[in-house]
């Protein structure tokens, strides 16, 4: 029935329609993102919760419950009693905590224990056994690098010696021990406060000669210790 009253029908503008649609979509996206964040928080281990890490340590299988915040250095020394890996600077600058992870030089102070999952880890305590398994151990049952350090008096206080030896093994394996200058360059990530560098270089060159190393590679220079450790960088690429 027409009562004579004028009526105006409402028709939304194009701008109003788009604005409303965008606001609705934004609200839905925000809700979805909030749900994702809540799910991630729910899956995250509670503070202080331990995680299981399975790896090989000096040829023996290990499954350990570790604090995700704990470093490999502390795990090896305090958890496993392998005190040959030394505490130095805890900043990746001295090389005293050098270990091998999947054959590469890695600083224990910059590596989380949880990163060792599935890895083969060798410390100074396992080096002689590794040499024996490879058929290169000396008559005294030492790795050739260990024997060369003894013969050349390549230490004084001895605190840095385990890290020096662990780096030297990699430097030799990668073919960077052809001269004293080259040894010094590729061993530069390891500091010796007693300044036994001439004897250290001589020991590395002697061991390289005895082992007949000819391989080529990246070496153990300090620049390779910074950032993501090499054994893990490749897995994450």
Per-region residue spans from a language model:
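Signature of N-terminal electron-transfer/Fe-S-associated modules in redox systems
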Residues: 2-237
């Amino acid at each position: 029935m027409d009562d004579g009253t004028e009526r105006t029908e409402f028709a939304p503008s194009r701008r109003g329609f788009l604005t409303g649609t965008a606001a609705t979509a934004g609200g839905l996206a925000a809700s979805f993102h909030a749900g994702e964040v809540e799910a991630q928080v729910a899956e995250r281990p509670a503070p202080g919760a331990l995680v299981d890490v399975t790896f090989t340590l000096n040829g023996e299988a290990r499954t350990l419950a570790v604090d995700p915040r704990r470093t490999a250095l502390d795990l090896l020394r305090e958890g496993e009693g392998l005190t040959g890996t030394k505490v130095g600077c805890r900043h990746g600058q001295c090389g005293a905590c050098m270990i091998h992870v999947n054959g590469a030089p890695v600083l224990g102070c910059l590596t989380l224990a949880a990163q060792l999952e599935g890895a083969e880890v060798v410390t100074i305590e396992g080096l002689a056994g590794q040499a024996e398994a490879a058929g290169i151990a000396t008559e005294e049952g030492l790795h050739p690098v260990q024997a060369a350090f003894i013969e050349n008096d390549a230490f004084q206080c001895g605190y840095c010696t385990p890290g020096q030896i662990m780096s030297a093994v990699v430097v030799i394996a990668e073919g960077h021990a052809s001269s004293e200058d080259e040894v010094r360059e590729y061993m530069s990530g390891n500091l010796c406060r007693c300044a036994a560098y001439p004897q250290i270089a001589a020991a590395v060159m002697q061991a390289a000669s005895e082992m007949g190393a000819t391989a080529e590679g990246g070496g153990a220079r300090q620049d390779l210790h910074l950032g993501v450790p090499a054994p893990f960088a490749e897995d994450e690429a």
